[in-house]
Amino acid sequence: MLHVRGLGLPGCLALAALASLVHSQHVFLAPQQALSLLQRVRRANSGFLEELRKGNLERECVEEQCSYEEAFEALESPQDTDVFWAKYTVCDSVRKPRETFMDCLEGRCAMDLGLNYHGNVSVTHTGIECQLWRSRYPHRPDINSTTHPGADLKENFCRNPDSSTSGPWCYTTDPTVRREECSIPVCGQEGRTTVKMTPRSRGSKENLSPPLGECLLERGRLYQGNLAVTTLGSPCLAWDSLPTKTLSKYQNFDPEVKLVQNFCRNPDRDEEGAWCFVAQQPGFEYCSLNYCDEAVGEENHDGDESIAGRTTDAEFHTFFDERTFGLGEADCGLRPLFEKKSLTDKTEKELLDSYIDGRIVEGWDAEKGIAPWQVMLFRKSPQELLCGASLISDRWVLTAAHCILYPPWDKNFTENDLLVRIGKHSRTRYERNVEKISMLEKIYIHPRYNWRENLDRDIALLKLKKPVPFSDYIHPVCLPDKQTVTSLLQAGYKGRVTGWGNLRETWTTNINEIQPSVLQVVNLPIVERPVCKASTRIRITDNMFCAGFKVNDTKRGDACEGDSGGPFVMKSPYNHRWYQMGIVSWGEGCDRNGKYGFYTHVFRLKRWMQKVIDQHR
């Protein structure tokens, strides 16, 4: 296989490709946009041509035919000569005209299998944007810069590192399509490409709100229509039927919402919208209606006005039924080794100060007991750390759905495949008399979890077989109410992420270089929603928020592989409790400039959690 190293990319084409993509929110590009990336840009002079001028190589090898020895005399390096000679021999058949020959040498077009191609096309022949070669989302590549160091696997540009007979290709950003070929111009054959461009027809993925007159406000709370079938096609049970009365006995329904026949309604102000009871487990399902976009939190207010100047009720109110939820909610978020002893951890003040001045802190080794709600989701066979998670009561654990079910990574775990380890500090060592190991009774994944597109509603509940006893190192975190979300989930305010994930993004085979020995902590600022949306071409929904450092920030930090499913928490300055605002969900690489970590918006899915938990009476 011929590997090409050290050749510059054509700058104009790079700018054209990136400019055409950066404003798009589509996974699938429009045909005109996709085809525009295939236009070749001519340059009067180039970095490669400058290299050729060294030692009259241009005259010897471009204007005339040269030998390997003549090229070596000019370049004076076996490695540089091998790189040049590999391209030179491939491109020898298109020496005329000179412009075509230079296109081939500089990798702006493909010859034969396209091993010479080093251009900036980053979309497949069907219009799917390419995945970054260094990223593991949505697909885990088996070809990367470590396995193929000479293949020039930069950004998400199409390449042919494995000598595919179809020519240059890439991993795609579509979770259902692992890899696909790209349409690359063929050298010396105007209008011909390595494979034909056949863009797919896909629906719009714009983040547009429906017109006000065509959508339901308040997530359908006042909906009075006659829809009586759920999104999954299940018939709704009548609200006055015996099974429904039993299921809703302890529900606190809004009296303004009229529960008529078996029509879909939203009597508990569920952020997911209207729903109804059904005959099968978990006993309820959601209905398909068109809701207006009404984001909760993440508004960018002045810190002094929103925190220091606001009178807020600091009294804590429980939300769940203790009979089904278990113990711990009344005392949640108060750490035994800190708040209960009137102590603070070493960066807590800076975290709280961010609500006013927005200072930034790097990651560090966690103090013991700093996150007593942290859970390790552990695979039984082979034994390995799978994900993070969080303890929300003595019976229930919260994690990301993709930790349980994600077909692109061959994940589809059952209760028998997993266990949870609670109270841990060390990543690998068994901590006798401190950690507790618990088996799972039941896994609940959100019925609208969307792994095929964007990991929307990336949330799962784990029911423990036995209640776990609390200790100095085992204690539940609080789940936020609307007031807490409105007060704290604002751009510039900082939350805390904990986990045993990789310390940095790398393809090294030496695991000890990148995996921490103990629990890690990092404080991250919440990012404005428009900035989040502009940072990616993956569709962002109201069930997500993003956090992380911007390009001009002096400090760094991010969640990384292995942190998934873990908590994003914030401390309330009113009642001094810790609330889980988010679940570590996904990101395009770790701590990359212009990229942020995305988190599941816990509050928006809290009513779903309540209804699932209430079935366990």
From Swiss-Prot:
Catalytic activity entry: Selective cleavage of Arg-|-Gly bonds in fibrinogen to form fibrin and release fibrinopeptides A and B
Residue list for modification 4-carboxyglutamate: E50, E51, E58, E60, E63, E64, E69, E70, E73, E76
EC annotation from Swiss-Prot or TrEMBL: 3.4.21.5
Span of domain Gla: 44-90
Classification via CDD domains: KR, Tryp_SPc
SUPFAM superfamilies, per the entry: GLA-domain (SSF57630), Kringle-like (SSF57440), Trypsin-like serine proteases (SSF50494)
Record PTM: The gamma-carboxyglutamyl residues, which bind calcium ions, result from the carboxylation of glutamyl residues by a microsomal enzyme, the vitamin K-dependent carboxylase. The modified residues are necessary for the calcium-dependent interaction with a negatively charged phospholipid surface, which is essential for the conversion of prothrombin to thrombin. In the penultimate step of the coagulation cascade, prothrombin is converted to thrombin by the prothrombinase complex composed of factor Xa (F10), cofactor Va (F5), and phospholipids. This activation requires factor Xa-catalyzed sequential cleavage at 2 sites, Arg-310 and Arg-359, along 2 possible pathways. In the first pathway, the first cleavage occurs at Arg-310, leading to the formation of the inactive intermediate prethrombin-2. This pathway preferentially occurs on platelets and in the absence of cofactor Va.
Kringle domain span: 109-187, 215-292
Signal peptide interval: 1-24
Region feature High affinity receptor-binding region which is also known as the TP508 peptide, mapped onto this chain: 547-569
Disulfide bridge map: C61-C66, C91-C104, C109-C187, C130-C170, C158-C182, C215-C292, C236-C276, C264-C287, C332-C478, C387-C403, C532-C546, C560-C590
Keywords for the protein's UniProt record, in alphabetical order: Acute phase, Blood coagulation, Calcium, Cleavage on pair of basic residues, Disulfide bond, Gamma-carboxyglutamic acid, Glycoprotein, Hemostasis, Hydrolase, Kringle, Protease, Repeat, Serine protease, Signal, Zymogen
GO molecular function annotation: calcium ion binding; endopeptidase activity; heparin binding; lipopolysaccharide binding; peptidase activity; receptor ligand activity; serine-type endopeptidase activity; signaling receptor binding
Record text on subunit structure and interactions: Heterodimer (named alpha-thrombin) of a light and a heavy chain; disulfide-linked. Forms a heterodimer with SERPINA5. In plasma, interacts (via N-terminus) with alpha-1-microglobulin; this interaction does not prevent the activation of prothrombin to thrombin.
Known function: Thrombin, which cleaves bonds after Arg and Lys, converts fibrinogen to fibrin and activates factors V, VII, VIII, XIII, and, in complex with thrombomodulin, protein C. Functions in blood homeostasis, inflammation and wound healing. Activates coagulation factor XI (F11); activation is promoted by the contact with negatively charged surfaces. Triggers the production of pro-inflammatory cytokines, such as MCP-1/CCL2 and IL8/CXCL8, in endothelial cells.
Miscellaneous comment text of the record: Thrombin can itself cleave the N-terminal fragment (fragment 1) of the prothrombin, prior to its activation by factor Xa.
Protein's UniProt name: Prothrombin
Taxonomy of the source species: Eukaryota, Metazoa, Chordata, Craniata, Vertebrata
